UniProtKB/Swiss-Prot annotation:
<dbReference type="InterPro" id="IPR000783">
    <property type="entry name" value="RNA_pol_subH/Rpb5_C"/>
</dbReference>
<keyword id="KW-0804">Transcription</keyword>
<comment type="function">
    <text>DNA-dependent RNA polymerase catalyzes the transcription of DNA into RNA using the four ribonucleoside triphosphates as substrates. Component of RNA polymerase II which synthesizes mRNA precursors and many functional non-coding RNAs. Pol II is the central component of the basal RNA polymerase II transcription machinery. It is composed of mobile elements that move relative to each other. Component of RNA polymerase IV which mediates short-interfering RNAs (siRNA) accumulation and subsequent RNA-directed DNA methylation-dependent (RdDM) transcriptional gene silencing (TGS) of target sequences.</text>
</comment>
<dbReference type="Pfam" id="PF01191">
    <property type="entry name" value="RNA_pol_Rpb5_C"/>
</dbReference>
<dbReference type="InterPro" id="IPR035913">
    <property type="entry name" value="RPB5-like_sf"/>
</dbReference>
<protein>
    <recommendedName>
        <fullName>DNA-directed RNA polymerases II and IV subunit 5A</fullName>
    </recommendedName>
</protein>
<dbReference type="GO" id="GO:0006351">
    <property type="term" value="P:DNA-templated transcription"/>
</dbReference>
<dbReference type="GO" id="GO:0000418">
    <property type="term" value="C:RNA polymerase IV complex"/>
</dbReference>
<keyword id="KW-0240">DNA-directed RNA polymerase</keyword>
<comment type="subunit">
    <text>Component of the RNA polymerases II and IV complexes. Interacts with NRPD1.</text>
</comment>
<dbReference type="InterPro" id="IPR020608">
    <property type="entry name" value="RNA_pol_subH/Rpb5_CS"/>
</dbReference>
<dbReference type="InterPro" id="IPR005571">
    <property type="entry name" value="RNA_pol_Rpb5_N"/>
</dbReference>
<dbReference type="Pfam" id="PF03871">
    <property type="entry name" value="RNA_pol_Rpb5_N"/>
</dbReference>
<dbReference type="GO" id="GO:0003677">
    <property type="term" value="F:DNA binding"/>
</dbReference>
<dbReference type="InterPro" id="IPR036710">
    <property type="entry name" value="RNA_pol_Rpb5_N_sf"/>
</dbReference>
<comment type="similarity">
    <text>Belongs to the archaeal Rpo5/eukaryotic RPB5 RNA polymerase subunit family.</text>
</comment>
<dbReference type="GO" id="GO:0005665">
    <property type="term" value="C:RNA polymerase II, core complex"/>
</dbReference>
Length: 205
């Protein structure tokens, strides 16, 4: 059974996750964003376990583009758990997931993630990272990931190679928040006092 402190933590983590997924373009109901701690506990019950929070979400504009959120029970996640998750994903044709871990992954589990990365895209966040939404603390401008077609148009319009664009590291906290992958180009829109808005592009490396 989870302690009062753990319930409070998980409530905050869940809230950050829902905000993050909405920012990535997934369908998140308003009620999921405005849920209070009391509603959260009522929904999941006093005997809530981490695995009760497992969720499957789809993109707003594409129902088939789905993502799982897993909350492993063990503090250090090993290969066995990873295999269980990927088998579940495979059987349901879901190729992307977020793991919210209490501490970390074992070295073997890390290796497992890179070995399956061509088929499954698994993102790992520690619970501590998700207690606060980074966007509430840093002034984060709007980020839009370009589609392959939009990226091609952009490069042709400016006659540049993608590698000539300014870069953003895939490990950057903001890149992780938006779930960016290497090779993608992200459009960043900042408010500008003179031009109304100021647009830049970054290449994810």
């Amino acid at each position: 059974m989870l302690t009062e402190e753990e319930l409070k933590r998980l409530y905050r983590i869940q809230k950050t996750l829902m905000q993050m997924l909405r920012d990535r373009g997934y369908f998140i109901a308003d009620s999921e964003l405005t849920m209070t701690k009391q509603q959260f506990i009522r929904k999941h019950g006093d005997n809530m376990k981490r695995e009760d929070l497992v969720t499957l979400k789809a993109k707003r504009n594409d129902n088939s583009d789905q993502l799982y959120i897993f909350f492993p029970d063990e503090a250090k996640v090993g290969v066995k758990t990873m295999k269980m998750y990927t088998n579940r994903m495979k059987s349901e044709n879901v190729f992307r997931a977020i793991l919210v871990v209490q501490q970390n992954l074992t070295p073997f589990a890390r290796t497992c993630i890179s070995e399956i990365s061509s088929k499954f895209h698994l993102e790992v966040f520690q619970e501590a990272e998700m207690l606060v939404n980074i966007k509430e603390h840093v002034l984060v401008p709007e980020h839009q990931v370009l589609t392959t077609e939009e990226k091609k148009t952009l490069l042709e319009r400016y006659t540049v190679k993608e590698t000539q664009l300014p870069r953003i590291q895939v490990t950057d906290p903001i890149a992780r928040y938006f779930g960016l992958k290497r090779g993608q180009v992200v459009k960043i829109i900042r408010p500008s006092e003179t031009a109304g808005r100021y647009v830049t592009y970054r290449y994810v490396v």
